[in-house]
């Protein structure tokens, strides 16, 4: 009987615990369901907002493209002939600057080539006495002619680029520039100082060329490049030959620098006795060093 009395309240206690556990599980399942519903709602709202934002972004991009196209076509339709003239004048100025640079580079290259050929040519005997002043005047007159010819052609090309005639294109102007450059090279290479034929010409042609050089003044002296380094006339034998950079470099490399036989007192290595305060040894060594220097 006692056992049955004890088992009765235990069974009741277990039943109550089971009921409470089941109720807690039911409550937890309900809360989980609510949380899942809330998550689904938020996900759906986020997807909806994302779609709306994508649509607005596409619409804004289309509006920007339309505005750019409208502004581009509007500027093209509203462009005036004055703007076209300014653009063409700017292009002509750039083209003229390029032409001037090409002409100056061509003249410098031709003068350098002539000087190199002169230095490399072997000496030969001329018939009759050679006057250095006449050859110098002939070279200057020829240089003046070429520079004046190039200036006239450049001015004519500038006028044509500002007011281009009908029926002429850019190809004709380019061919004209190439032809002018060829003519200038032929005139510079065919001068009196380029070969023996120019030195053996008669005196009448020399006089006419000097007269032409005196009558035609040079408007641009900065473009002239002197062909002869001698200014006052005469032969090169009177002028001393200056040594080049390579020769000076070789001399400096071969030079030997002297040094004292005995190192100075500041560079002498101290011994342990001198470091720890033995002054007598340091003084005696200093006296010996002075005596050695005096004997040297």
From Swiss-Prot:
Gene name tied to this protein: CCDC190
Ranges where the record places region Disordered: 80-144, 183-241
Biased composition (Polar residues): 101-120, 135-144
Domain of life: Eukaryota
Biased composition (Basic and acidic residues): 201-221
Segments passing through the bilayer: none
Keywords: Coiled coil
Keyword Coiled coil: yes
Recorded coiled-coil stretches: 15-69
Entry-linked InterPro entries: CC190
Protein's UniProt keywords contain Coiled coil: yes
PANTHER family recorded: COILED-COIL DOMAIN-CONTAINING PROTEIN 190 (PTHR36871:SF1)
Species whose genome carries this gene: Bos taurus
Protein name from the UniProt record: Coiled-coil domain-containing protein 190
């Amino acid at each position: 009987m006692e056992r049955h009395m004890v088992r009765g309240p235990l069974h009741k206690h277990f039943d109550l615990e089971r009921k409470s556990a089941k109720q807690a599980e039911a409550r937890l399942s309900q809360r989980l369901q609510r949380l899942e519903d809330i998550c689904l709602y938020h996900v759906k709202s986020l997807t909806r907002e994302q779609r709306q934002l994508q649509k607005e972004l596409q619409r804004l991009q289309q509006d920007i493209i339309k505005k750019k196209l409208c502004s581009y076509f509007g500027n093209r339709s509203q462009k005036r002939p004055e703007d076209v003239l300014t653009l063409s004048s700017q292009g002509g100025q750039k083209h003229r600057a390029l032409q001037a640079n090409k002409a100056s580079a061509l003249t410098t290259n031709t003068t350098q080539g002539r000087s190199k050929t002169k230095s490399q040519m072997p000496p030969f005997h001329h018939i009759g006495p050679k006057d250095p002043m006449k050859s110098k005047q002939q070279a200057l007159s020829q240089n003046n002619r070429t520079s004046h010819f190039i200036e006239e052609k450049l001015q004519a090309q500038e006028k044509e680029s500002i007011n281009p005639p009908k029926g002429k294109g850019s190809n004709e102007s380019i061919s004209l520039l190439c032809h002018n450059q060829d003519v200038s090279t032929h005139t510079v290479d065919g001068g009196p100082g380029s070969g023996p034929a120019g030195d053996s010409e008669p005196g009448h042609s020399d006089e006419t060329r000097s007269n032409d050089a005196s009558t035609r003044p040079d408007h641009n002296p900065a473009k002239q490049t002197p062909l002869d380094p001698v200014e006052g006339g005469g032969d090169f034998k009177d002028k001393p030959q200056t040594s080049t950079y390579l020769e000076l470099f070789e001399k400096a490399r071969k030079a030997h620098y002297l040094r004292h036989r005995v190192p100075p007192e500041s560079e002498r290595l101290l011994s342990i006795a001198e470091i720890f305060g033995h002054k007598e040894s340091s003084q005696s060594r200093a006296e010996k060093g002075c005596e050695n220097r005096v004997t040297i």
